[in-house]
């Protein structure tokens, strides 16, 4: 899949997690999923590192737009 497809899947998954568990828990749990979604991608270590600092959906969206 392309980066745009992966990014949209991450954001969709994040929205579902937030709906189910709230933003605080949903974002924290998505950190490991982001690592799974980006495993094997070139230069993904920085994205995984930076995603561990994200605390809101908006921050994640900005990070993914910046990294893309």
What are these regions (language model features)?
Residues 1-68:
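Alpha/beta catalytic cores of nucleotide-metabolism and tRNA/nucleoside-modifying enzymes
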